[in-house]
Regions:
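Extended, domain-scale alpha-helical bundle/helix-rich regions
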Residues: 1-72, 76-81
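Short, mixed charged/polar active-site loops
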Residues: 151-156, 328-330, 345
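Conserved functional hotspot residues or short segments at active or partner-binding sites
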Residues: 9-18, 340-502
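Amphipathic, well-packed alpha-helical segments that form the structural scaffold of globular domains
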Residues: 17-21, 40-44, 48, 108-111, ...
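Short acidic, Pro/Gly- and aromatic-enriched capping/linker segments at domain boundaries
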Residues: 325-337
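Acidic, S/T/G-rich, low-cysteine, solvent-exposed domains in lumenal/extracellular/periplasmic regions
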Residues: 291, 312-316, 327-329, 351, ...
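Cleft-lining beta-strand/loop regions that shape enzyme active-site pockets
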Residues: 28-32, 54-70, 79, 85-90, ...
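Structural motif
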Residues: 104-106, 344
Length: 503
């Protein structure tokens, strides 16, 4: 691959040597904590697919992901050779506010307040991060080698740690307005939810109010790639779109079943709603999508979801009065299975959208069903709930319009071609080592990409290019799946179905 990327033999040799050297170094830097976690998880996964042990550092990272916050300087770090490099800074964080730290700067030393500097060249990234993070209000000093110049000038930057909110991982909304077509100029709201973190429902409620103030005609909730998170937040999120009622059923052991309900009697948004999912939408995402589908409250579009229908509990191994200097980490273990309010389980089967998109991901090849020791699918009794207006008749109309539209859409034509090519190649168990053959394959792929790019440019009324390197830097990446979700939502609005009207 390096030779195909126009590297000389000497350059390829040097680069591979560096890669292998770094890999060996990382292996040698492994600690007993890493080995213990690996051994414990090898045992835990023989019990059940989602039972695991988290080392102290990974347990801390789990809490950070759930709370979308941490205490530190607000910088994203990455290891490059023996250096810890600043890749980006969090807007509004101490690193950003200082004005003294920029992307590509290298951290070569770390000191706590007035203590001596510790040289961190060659250290593991997580160990450097451990030194830099600390309680809000405390001081950390960094020796920084500027990355933007050839001269190796080192400066000392003193920063006061603060609580950092990971805004880039929080729910966001935008107004989607088609520029062409029968609905040109008509606004839809799109709420993108990356995960079910703590207080997600509060964030989404704010985004809904913002979209309503902009008079959107409908809302799309984008759950693509959302692997789940808090079960409580899945219930609260569902409650934003229904007045009250059961959201998910949970069975502990062999018999006890509890029902998580929305009880506030309030609705944040009562208009047309579409939920966009893919094969990587899992767990809490499936709870929300399934509830919306069972209530006939929203139209579900996209790919069949992952199929994770189990509930895990996260518990620290330390006790409140423990006197250990070092934390012990935590365990996650499966305590229950959750079920749709119609009684079915999402385990293995996931949520099957009302309108399925073409997909290269085969459910039999990726998902919960591929996990070793995954619990089986089963079902329980239906919960007591009332559906919204029956949308079956409207669904036939929407599906017909969708199928007709994607047959005429160049982007979906490309997607179908890619799926066909993937299926033809996925079972090949050989690859040519003949340079001329590989170069021919590369040229063919580049020509196909260039032809597609020029077709898109023409469609957008822009000038074509002669090479892929000449593509405009500000050219927006197309999202045909979201575009089609918008088209389906407009179709749904025209039918007058899937709004909140009781039978």
């Amino acid at each position: 691959n390096l030779i195909l990327a126009d590297k000389t033999w000497e350059e390829a040799k040097e680069l591979l040597t560096k890669r292998y050297t770094r890999a060996i170094k990382r292996t040698k830097q492994a600690k007993s904590e890493d080995v213990f976690q690996t051994a414990m998880n090898a045992f835990a996964r023989t019990i059940e697919a989602h039972t695991s042990y988290l080392s102290p550092r990974n347990a801390e990272r789990f809490q950070m992901d759930m709370n979308l916050s941490f205490e530190g300087i607000g910088a994203v770090l990455q290891s490059e050779d023996d250096y810890t490099v600043i890749k980006s800074v969090v807007p509004g964080g101490p690193a950003d506010e200082s004005g003294a730290i920029k992307p590509e700067d290298k951290i070569v030393g770390v000191a706590q307040d007035d203590e001596e500097f510790v040289d961190v060249i060659g250290w593991r990234l997580d160990e450097v991060v451990e030194l830099i993070k600390g309680p809000k209000g405390s001081t950390v000093r960094l020796q920084v080698e500027k990355g933007a110049t050839d001269a190796k000038t080192t400066s000392v930057v003193s920063l006061t740690r603060d609580k950092i909110k990971l805004e880039d991982r929080a729910a966001k909304s935008e107004v989607y307005v088609p520029e062409t077509g029968p609905h040109a100029g008509e606004p839809l709201g799109v709420i993108t939810i990356p995960s079910f973190y703590n207080n997600l429902s509060m964030d989404v409620a704010k985004e809904i109010e913002s979209l309503k103030a902009q008079n959107v005609k409908g809302v799309i909730v984008d759950l693509r790639g959302n692997g789940g998170g808090s079960l409580t937040e899945a219930t609260l999120l569902t409650g934003l779109f229904i007045e009250k009622g059961p959201v998910v059923q949970i069975r502990y052991g062999q018999s006890k079943v509890s029902v998580n309900r929305d009880t506030d009697g309030e609705v944040a948004y009562d208009g047309p709603l579409t939920v966009l999912v893919d094969r990587y939408s899992a767990s809490a995402s499936e709870i929300f999508a399934a509830a919306m589908q069972d209530y006939n409250r929203a139209l579900i579009v996209g790919e069949q979801t992952f199929g994770k229908g189990t509930v895990q509990q996260h518990r620290g191994l330390g006790k409140i009065y423990d006197l250990y200097d070092n934390p012990l980490g935590s365990v996650q273990f499966t305590i229950a299975k959750f079920y749709r309010i119609d009684g079915g389980s999402t385990q293995h089967k996931g949520v099957i959208p009302d309108i399925l998109y073409p997909s290269a991901v085969e459910p039999a090849e990726w998902g919960e069903s591929q996990a070793e020791n995954a619990l089986p699918w089963d079902s329980i009794n239906r919960a007591n709930y009332t559906t919204f207006a029956d949308g079956t008749a409207a669904l036939d109309v929407l599906t017909a319009k969708h199928n007709k539209r994607i047959l005429q859409d160049p982007e979906f034509s490309y997607i179908q071609d890619d799926i066909k090519e993937y299926k033809e190649n996925k079972d090949k168990n050989f690859i040519s080592l003949v340079k001329s053959v590989r170069e021919g394959e590369k040229k063919e792929a580049e020509e196909k990409s260039l032809a597609r790019a020029n077709e898109r440019l023409q469609r957008l009324g822009m000038e074509t290019v002669t090479t892929l390197d000449d593509l405009p830097e500000d050219m927006e990446e197309l999202d045909p799946f979201l575009d089609e979700a918008a088209n389906i939502t407009f179709d749904m609005i025209e039918t007058g179905r899937y709004a909140i009207t009781r039978n």
